[in-house]
A protein has these predicted regions:
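Non-catalytic signal-transmission and effector/linker regions of two-component phosphorelay proteins
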Residues: 1-13, 111-133
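Conserved acidic carboxylate
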Residues: 16
Length: 133
């Protein structure tokens, strides 16, 4: 069966500290025609990448807990740049802080097909205030 390549031409950031999960997500995205930044396994690296590549990113996949550090500063930066994202987590999705409760959230272990559907449903890249190529 041929892939739909629904994400062709899109560019996503993966922020995940578990190698196998990150690798699996990256492979699934690339098979759908997307390009991937990362995976990045820590908050500092993710913040740097968002700052450097914000004008290119179509979205991001965020693990909430990165070896004890919460990913929320990255989520805040993405929201500031109006870059959509989805949480993929071992935590209960309903336990997120109020500013993020409306964001898409998938529980681990993540069904890759479900992740691809969520990503395909995120808004397309738009010019972003304060972000210049």
């Amino acid at each position: 069966m041929q892939k739909s390549r629904a994400l062709a031409g899109r560019f996503y950031l993966i922020v995940e500290d578990e190698y196998l999960a990150a690798s699996s997500m990256m492979t699934a995205l690339e098979e759908e025609g997307a390009q991937v930044a990362g995976p990045v396994s820590n908050v500092a690296g993710a913040l740097a990448l968002v700052s450097e590549r914000a004008c290119e990113l179509d979205g991001a996949i965020l693990d909430i807990n990165l070896r004890g550090a919460m990913v929320y500063p990255v989520a805040e930066k993405l929201a500031e740049y109006q870059i959509p994202f989805v949480f993929v987590t071992g935590y209960e999705c309903g336990s997120m802080p109020d500013p993020f409760k409306a964001m898409p959230c998938l529980n681990k272990p993540c069904n890759e097909q479900e992740l691809l559907v969520v990503l395909a449903g995120l808004p397309a890249r738009q010019p972003r205030p304060g972000v210049h190529p």
